[in-house]
């Protein structure tokens, strides 16, 4: 779910997803093309690919449960789609801290 994804990003980076990540690099936000600009943009690319594989799921609106303990995200119980969407969303842990302000609103 997009609101849960925003919450995960804020918990991990301290940044709100909309102003900081919605228009970052080539792949963060809606759509994307070209070569990812850095590890943060690559994470967004991987996230898009992960969602793309879940063709029978409502990736942007499936509500899932997760917990955050000692810096680790654990996806909770739910339907197969809910668990898979959570797994896609938690990929952000790896690279979002490499954020560079120069790639905000990148064209």
From Swiss-Prot:
Q: Which transformation does this protein catalyse, written as a reaction?
A: a 1,2-diacyl-sn-glycero-3-phosphocholine + H2O = a 1-acyl-sn-glycero-3-phosphocholine + a fatty acid + H(+)
Q: Does the entry feature the keyword Transmembrane helix, yes or no?
A: no
Q: Read off the InterPro entries from this record.
A: PLipase_A2, PLipase_A2_dom, PLipase_A2_dom_sf, PLipase_A2_His_AS
At the top level, the lineage of the source is Eukaryota
Q: Which GO terms describe its cellular component?
A: extracellular region
Record: residues binding Ca(2+): 27, 29, 31, 48
**A GO biological-process term:** negative regulation of T cell proliferation
Where is it made, tissue-wise?
Answer: Expressed by the venom gland.
Record carries keyword Isomerase: no
**Where is it located?**
Secreted
GO molecular function ontology, one term from the record? calcium-dependent phospholipase A2 activity
Q: What does this protein do?
A: Heterodimer A-B: Sphenotoxin is a potent neurotoxin that possesses phospholipase A2 (PLA2) activity. It consists of a non-covalent association of a basic PLA2 subunit B with a non-enzymatic subunit A.
Q: Which family does it belong to?
A: Belongs to the phospholipase A2 family. Group II subfamily. D49 sub-subfamily.
What do we know about how this protein assembles, alone or with others? Heterodimer of A and B chains; non-covalently linked. The acidic protein (B chain) has phospholipase A2 activity and the A chain weakly inhibits the B chain enzymatic activity but potentiates its lethal potency.
Q: What is this protein called?
A: Basic phospholipase A2 sphenotoxin subunit B
| Organism for this UniProt entry | Ophryacus sphenophrys (Broad-horned pitviper)
């Amino acid at each position: 779910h997009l609101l849960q994804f925003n919450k995960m990003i804020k918990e991990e980076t301290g940044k709100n997803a909309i102003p900081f990540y919605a228009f970052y690099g080539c792949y963060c936000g809606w759509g994307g093309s070209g070569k990812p600009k850095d590890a943060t943009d690559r994470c967004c690319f991987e996230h898009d690919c992960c969602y793309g594989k879940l063709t029978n799921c409502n990736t942007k609106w499936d509500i899932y449960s997760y917990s955050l303990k000692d810096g680790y995200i654990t996806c909770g119980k739910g339907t197969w789609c809910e668990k898979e969407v959570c797994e896609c969303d938690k990929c952000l842990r790896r690279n979002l801290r490499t954020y560079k302000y120069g790639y905000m609103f990148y064209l």
